[in-house]
């Protein structure tokens, strides 16, 4: 059964790393990142030693700008998703990260 989870973060000016982890092995099927303010940058997505943005950073313009990915990767407690975000502005920025995931059963 797929589960949708929304997490909200405040991103101060500069580059920040946020971590999404799950206690049980989980397959991420969809990842949507929405910025309340425009002009932010998704610098990288990393799971374990694997970088998920081989073409480099994604610049998101305009308020409400979003990044939608369907990466189909697994995460767990020892291999969380690290999301590197850059806020080039001078004030805090708000992001909402929505994931659709499915628990992996053995």
What kind of feature is each model-predicted range?
Residues 1-106:
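Beta-strand-centric surfaces of beta-sandwich/beta-rich domains
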